[in-house]
Amino acid sequence: MEIPIQVAVRIFPHRELKDLLRSFGPTEPKKDAQAVDEGADSKDSEAQVPAAEKDNPSISETDPNGNAEQDSAADSKTIPDANGNDSGQKDYPDSAYCVQAIPISASALGLPSALPGGDPMDSIAAGLIQVGPHTVPVTHALPSSSSQEQVYHQTVFPLITLFLEGFDASVVTYGQRGQGKSYTLYGNVQDPTLTDSTEGVVQLCVRDIFSHISLHPERTYAINVGFVEICGGDVCDLLGMGNIHCTNVDAVFHWLQVGLSARQSLPAHTLFTLTLEQQWVSKEGLLQHRLSTASFSDLCGTERCGDQPPGRPLDAGLCMLEQVISTLTDPGLMYGVNGNIPYGQTTLTTLLKDSFGGRAQTLVILCVSPLEEHLPETLGNLQFAFKVQCVRNFVIMNTYSDDNTMIVQPAEPVPESNSSAGPLSQAGPGDNFGLQFAASQWSKLVTNAEGLFSKLIDSKLITEVEKEQIEEWLFLKQECEECLSSTEAMRQQKQLVPILEAEEPEDVNSEAANSESPNSDNENDTDNESHRPDLDDKIESLMEEFRDKTDALILEKHAEYLSKHPKAVMQSQDREIEAQPPEENGDDRKVSIGSRRRSVQPGASLSTAELAMLNRVASQQPPPPIDPESVVDPLESSSGEGIRQAALAAAAATAPIEQLQKKLRKLVAEIEGKQRQLREIEETIQVKQNIIAELVKNSDTRSHAKQRFHKKRAKLEAECDKAKKQLGKALVQGRDQSEIERWTTIIGHLERRLEDLSSMKHIAGESGQKVKKLQQSVGESRKQADDLQKKLRKECKLRCQMEAELAKLRESRETGKELVKAQGSPEQQGRQLKAVQARITHLNHILREKSDNLEEQPGPEQQETLRHEIRNLRGTRDLLLEERCHLDRKLKRDKVLTQKEERKLLECDEAIEAIDAAIEFKNEMITGHRSIDTSDRIQREKGEQMLMARLNRLSTEEMRTLLYKYFTKVIDLRDSSRKLELQLVQLERERDAWEWKERVLSNAVRQARLEGERNAVLLQRQHEMKLTLMLRHMAEETSASSASYGERALAPACVAPPVQASSDFDYDHFYKGGGNPSKALIKAPKPMPTGSALDKYKDKEQRSGRNIFAKFHVLTRYASAAAAGSSGSTAEESTALIESTTTATATTTSTTTTGAVGKVKDKALVSFRPEQLKRLMPAPTATKVTRQKNKIIIQDASRRN
């Protein structure tokens, strides 16, 4: 079980000691004050606390929180501190308390208990320690006025109770130097100068342990003590003899005194261990063996350094202990070390491994100082104590069970005194552990010698005489083994000892823990088997062969049994089985009465191997089919028996119907899920085919746009080359820096436009690849749909078969019901009763004739005795039947029975069957037939014949005892089997529920995956439609452009036009007019543009670039939106992003184009004559109409989708 570590905080009584020192004489205060100041051994500093409590009654008075208060008469002027505690007298201002213990009622807070099923007072946090504004919850809050007995009974005594039951216990004292750690553990009994000594926790524990042992004289025990000291990483044995066996309290106290006297003066840790080993015989005659250890650790002072609180202790062992606690409580640190807790870094943590995170129930007693000058140290220790409470130990019982080992009670009674109780070696004649160990060692030596002799024979290095001696030795050894094995088998068959089974859950846990050693012994075997991967297959094949042969042998023996067995005996057995009222048995009692499996110990549960065997048998034996025609003949049984049999058949027929309905529901759910998936796949295929058709239909548009982009790219590349040549000329001729910058800007702009055109060309040429991918995806979807259709056809066929089978079962059940109704009618019952009476009359006549014939046979006195015994047995059987019917009626009425009544019901069943067997045997003796036992005696094996011979030699009392034991074992086995069947039914229900949930979730996941694929295909279709419209629009705008940017840029600066055309590419008529001076299209030459004019030119170029490449930015944004949608966003978010981007871009393009047209018109009216306006005026209306038309088409397509 998992139990948290408990923490008890004890406040050091500084104030009480000072009052005690003032009340002493002039010679004593020096010694005591020196002990208080030194603090090397805290037992000296607290040695006078009990005496102070006795001499000064004012000290023993406590407030409601359990804190000691000063006598009001001593000094009426006292100043309370910030926590409300009395700060003491004015003469001792340094004795002000800043630590307060606040006990809390655990039941009032509803806190959980530290022990499973324990008292609420033993809760995890039953007190608070208040240090200034800080409050720390602890398991036990002990005020400064607490005595040693109070500390022991409140904190340590529950651990000792568990220790006596076989659990490990650990008590650790922790705290600042000189605060009473050693005094809490060992008291001051080791100081001979003190007249009034006080015992510590260790002494009180030892007294309680021996007191408990004296109350159980039937147990043998052994107590060993050890005392070690850890100083600087070295372990020193204070006793000098290791673990020492002690027989009484005085011996333990003596060795404890020796160890305390041998301690060093340096700061060190001490560890006192007490081991208790117990053995006794249980009521069933089985050996109980338990071993538990109690450790008492006195750690040295913390003496923290560094940033306080908390700081870190100076001692390396304590520092590593705090690191271990942090690792156990912090999952991050535990993950960092991969679960390898650093216990082995220091000697202290290695020895305390079981105490912190191990298998012992641990109590940490923290001794703190209440003074303000020790406040940082106190806070650091309290933080460590709070972490310790979060650590949980896995406490288990240390029990050892010896199977098939009977312990004989010693003839001499064990005295109740402590001194007379001896060690385990004095356990009596039943203790043969030493003999067993010697026998095992002898066997190992013989085995080793045999191997050595075999090697010598093979080596051919010995003479013939030596070889003959070795062979003779091997022959004698083989004969000895055969004799021992036969004797051991005979001894085990004679004793018929029960099998040991664990009765308590704690024993189960302890056996699981103690099974580590045998598992470690078998590691070599496991390693050898791991090198043979085919071993499991061979074992499985052999098991199958064994099952087949066993089934064939059983069928053969059954047929032989039926052929040899008399028919009358078979009919009598059938009548006996039918005589028991089956309708009064509950649903949970459908267990075969005649079934026999191997017996187990009385009162014990089934082991794991037995559970596995029963599960396998249950899975391999399906319920027999119910034949509606197999109705009990009314002439062979009474009418009531026929009705009961028909009712039983109808109840048995209900079980397969329910199972079949359950399978049918699962199958229908699978079929519905696959049908939905098939519809989704078909819809996805249709959408993909639509996309392919649209891509094929718009392939001409894409190819036309691709050609346009290619031509435009060629023009831009030529213009870029020209611009680079002009830039080179300008650099060679050393022209003005502004001109060089202008050409550099032009080249950069052309390169960017070339990159954009390459991207658009690539987008326009992707239609072929997309068609291929879509066609491949359609093929995969069709293949998936075909697979689903095949599975659907199979499942539909299986559903039809199951429905037909279910209809047959329902018909058989209806037939059974009609049979019950027909037999339940009064007329039918009357006819059956007459037929039965006629049958009974006929049988009585036959029985009388048989009786007359039997009376003529010899031995009438013996036959009469047997008949008298049979009549007595029948009377007993009637009484048992009456009691069983009473229990069945109570079960039917109350729906539940007590454990005792359930066991009584099973005992009645078994007793009735046993009486029937005895009656049958006696009838066979009367009639002169040979029993089955005698007829098959010759065919028995030799070992079985020997067993029967030994059983025949048993006396009547021994045979009665043996039969009673096996009768009890059979009852226990039937009870365990019934419980196992109930557990199996519950597990099957849970399994069915989880299978149904798993099926529903898997169908939902597959459905969601298919829906997501269909949504992605729909989005792709929308994207392709919009992309086609964009490419068509851009191709039209590109074809409407008549000139390029490079021709305008390459024109001389002196003839640059002062105005711009209505579109970005309508500059051809300007440059053409520049070559004919007769046309008045060009104004007077202007000087080179200045920096401000060049900036305006750049701004204008940037605005003009938005007109043609806005659609390309739409495509780029859509690509990014589609990537984001595929990585985690939903389809709706991607669609919204595309539509918003398209709308915004269209609006921006319209605004830019309209503004440019207006400006061009205004400037053209100023610069040109009216006859030239018609030739220079562009056609913006067509472009605008095309754009509006495309926008309407996109919106209509979005609404249709």
Swiss-Prot record:
Superkingdom of this protein's organism: Eukaryota
Disruption of the gene: reported phenotype: RNAi-mediated knockdown results in the increased expression of reactive oxygen species (ROS) in the gut of 7 day old conventionally reared adult flies. No increased ROS expression in germ-free adults and in response to bacteria-derived uracil.
Binding locations of ATP: G175, Q176, R177, G178, Q179, G180, K181, S182
Biased composition (Polar residues): 57-75
Start-end of Basic and acidic residues biased regions: 28-56
GO molecular function, one term: ATP hydrolysis activity
Biased composition regions of type Low complexity, renumbered to the chain: 510-521
Principal location: cytoplasm
An annotated GO cellular component: cilium
Region spans: Disordered: 23-92, 502-536, 565-606, 618-639
UniProt modified residues of type Phosphoserine: S599, S605
Subunit-level organization: Homodimer (Potential). Binds microtubules. Interacts with ci, smo, sgg, CkIalpha and protein kinase A catalytic subunit. Interacts (via kinesin motor domain) with Ubr3.
Function field: Regulates cubitus interruptus (ci) processing by recruiting multiple kinases to promote its efficient phosphorylation. Scaffolds multiple kinases and ci into proximity to promote its hyperphosphorylation, which then targets it for SCFSlimb/proteasome-mediated processing to generate its repressor form. Hh signaling inhibits ci phosphorylation by interfering with the cos-ci-kinases complex formation. Negatively regulates hh-signaling pathways during various processes, including photoreceptor differentiation.
Name of the molecule in the record: Kinesin-like protein costa
Highest classification ranks of the organism: Eukaryota, Metazoa, Ecdysozoa, Arthropoda, Hexapoda
Protein's gene: cos
